[in-house]
A protein has these predicted regions:
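Catalytic core of membrane glycerolipid acyltransferases/transacylases, capturing the structured
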Residues: 1-29, 35-36
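Non-catalytic C-terminal accessory region of glycerolipid acyltransferases
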Residues: 32-155
């Protein structure tokens, strides 16, 4: 799932659609996107999305929007939290290292359906993403061990 504007970028839009990416209208209730999300999850497929709703240019995790929690709770699916560090400075012209940490799946069983439950689940997801992000920051502060090169250095 990607913002509708990403689908309009020449070349990129066709690329992301080629592997099943669909659009979402941000800042409003996009019922068609929610139906698509629910269908994908109900069919047993993985659904990738940025639960914050956008890339965080500040470099720190943002607030988790309730849509992912809502779909996970309604469909009985787990959420796999992911923290990404380094995208705030990355660009195609100036690529920089980006680190990704995957957490354990969060089962949201027992969390009630409805606004209060979705907020509670979103807070759990946000807490876990922040924990993973803090871990990535700590790893970066330690630096790379001697003798270990980045893949780009090996070309």
């Amino acid at each position: 799932m990607a913002k509708i504007e990403a689908h309009r970028v020449p070349g990129f839009g066709a690329f992301i659609r080629s592997f099943g990416c669909f659009s979402v209208r941000r800042g409003e209730s996009d019922r068609e996107a929610v139906r698509t999300m629910r269908r994908i999850v109900a069919d047993g497929h993985a659904l990738g999305l940025f639960v914050e709703g956008t890339r965080q240019r500040s470099g720190v995790p943002g607030s988790v929007q309730p849509g992912a929690a809502m779909v996970a709770i309604q469909e009985g699916a787990p959420i796999v939290p992911v923290a990404i560090l380094g995208t705030q400075t990355w660009s195609p012209r100036h690529p920089t290292p980006v680190s990704i940490a995957w957490g354990e799946p969060l089962a949201l069983e027992g969390v009630p359906k409805g606004g209060k439950g979705y907020k509670e689940a979103s807070a759990q997801i946000e807490h876990e993403i922040r924990r993973l992000w803090d871990w990535l920051v700590a790893l970066h502060e330690q630096g790379r061990p001697d003798g270990v090169s980045l893949p780009a250095d090996r070309r």
